[in-house]
Structures are given as structure tokens and as C-alpha cells.
């Protein structure tokens, strides 16, 4: 994809995969990048064409206002986790922790719901899932369930938003702060 001159919005864009995407898009010539996080100050060495914004993907009113103020854009990337993930054996897991893991799904649906209206007709949405969506390892049932739901959501909404596109990126284990927190599963 040629991103030269494009306006790109990246939720979860200040750490991990999102931070890497922000910096790569900057290097590849994006005209403007808005990197969004609940804690944008954690990003260091912010490229010149990157603006940092503080928004929680679960705050629908903030999202509505943000997208309205931004106007049209070309690419929407969402890799915001939405919160914490429950880990460990499901039969011993606190069910509230399991339910809370779905904040990622609700954040993704909020961003797609409120952002698609402003996405250019030839625009693209990219959602980050993960390999546990298709191959669940012991202790990863919450991550697997959420990833599966995110992937099903993208497949389901694709025809509704056409000709705009929606794609899933589904990495394996990446050296990120979130992955490091899951090592002890």
C-alpha cells in the first residue's frame, strides 16, 4: 500500500505494535499521523508528522468528537488493547476478568462504528488480532476468544462498509510490553 501523502489514524499508536506502525508509516511518507492512546506520553522520539492524542477507545463520546473534528482520513489502524486480559485456565479464571478481556472487541467496534463515516471511499481499516484467535494455547482462552470475535467482526462488517476495506493483521508473539506480561502463562 502506498501511504505517501495519506492521513493515518492509529489507535494504540504509542506502544508495541502500534508504535512501530506509527514510526514506519512516518518513514514511508504519510502526510499526517495521529497516534492515539490512553497514555500518549509514553511514546518517545515522536516523528515530526505525528500528533499524539489521548482517547480511551471505550469512550464513545470522545470518539464521536474526535472523528468529527478530524474529518476525512485514509487509513484507520486499531491495535489498542482496551484494557487487561485474563490469563490462565478458564475453569479457574475469574469470570469478570474473562468478560473484561472483551474490552478490546468493544473498543474495536467503537472505533469502526464512529470512524468509518469519515474514512475515504478508497480507505482501509486494519485491526490487529493475534495467532491465539486460531490456535489457542493453554492459559490463553480469553485472548483466543477475543481475537476470534475481532476476526468474525471484521469478516461480518466488510460487505457493509464496501467499497471501504477492512483487514486483520494477526501476528504471533512479538516483543512488546503486552507480550512480556503474558510470558508466565
List each language-model region with its residue ranges.
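N-terminal Rossmann NAD(P)H-binding glycine-rich loop of SDR-like oxidoreductase domains
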Residues: 14, 21-23
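Conserved glycine-rich Rossmann-like NAD(P)H-binding loop of the short-chain dehydrogenase/reductase
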Residues: 30-43
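Rossmann-fold cofactor-recognition segment
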Residues: 47-61
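Conserved Rossmann-fold cofactor-binding substructure of NAD(P)-dependent oxidoreductases
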Residues: 58-71
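Conserved mid-core segment of classical short-chain dehydrogenase/reductases
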Residues: 81-97
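Catalytic loop of short-chain dehydrogenase/reductase
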Residues: 89, 98-104, 110, 124-150, ...
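Conserved SDR Rossmann-fold cofactor-binding beta-strand/turn motif
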Residues: 165-175
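Conserved small/polar residues in nucleotide/adenosyl-binding loops
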Residues: 184-185
Amino acid at each position: 500500500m502506498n501511504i505517501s501523502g495519506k492521513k493515518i489514524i492509529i489507535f494504540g499508536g504509542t506502544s508495541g505494535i502500534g508504535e512501530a506502525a506509527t514510526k514506519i508509516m512516518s518513514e514511508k511518507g504519510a502526510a499526517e499521523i495521529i497516534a492515539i492512546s490512553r497514555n500518549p506520553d509514553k511514546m518517545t522520539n515522536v516523528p515530526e508528522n505525528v500528533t499524539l492524542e489521548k482517547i480511551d477507545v471505550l469512550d464513545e463520546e470522545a470518539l464521536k468528537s474526535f472523528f468529527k473534528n478530524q474529518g476525512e482520513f485514509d487509513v484507520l489502524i486499531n491495535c489498542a488493547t482496551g484494557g487487561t486480559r485474563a490469563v490462565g485456565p478458564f475453569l479457574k479464571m475469574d469470570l469478570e476478568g474473562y468478560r473484561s478481556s472483551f474490552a478490546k472487541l468493544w473498543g474495536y467496534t467503537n472505533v469502526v462504528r464512529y470512524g468509518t463515516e469519515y474514512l475515504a471511499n478508497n480507505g482501509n481499516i486494519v485491526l490487529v488480532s493475534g495467532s491465539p484467535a486460531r490456535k489457542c494455547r493453554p492459559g490463553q482462552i480469553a485472548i483466543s476468544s477475543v481475537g476470534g470475535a475481532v476476526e468474525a467482526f471484521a469478516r461480518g462488517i466488510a460487505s457493509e462498509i464496501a467499497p471501504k476495506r477492512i483487514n486483520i493483521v494477526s501476528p504471533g508473539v512479538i516483543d512488546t510490553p503486552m507480550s512480556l506480561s503474558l510470558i508466565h502463562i
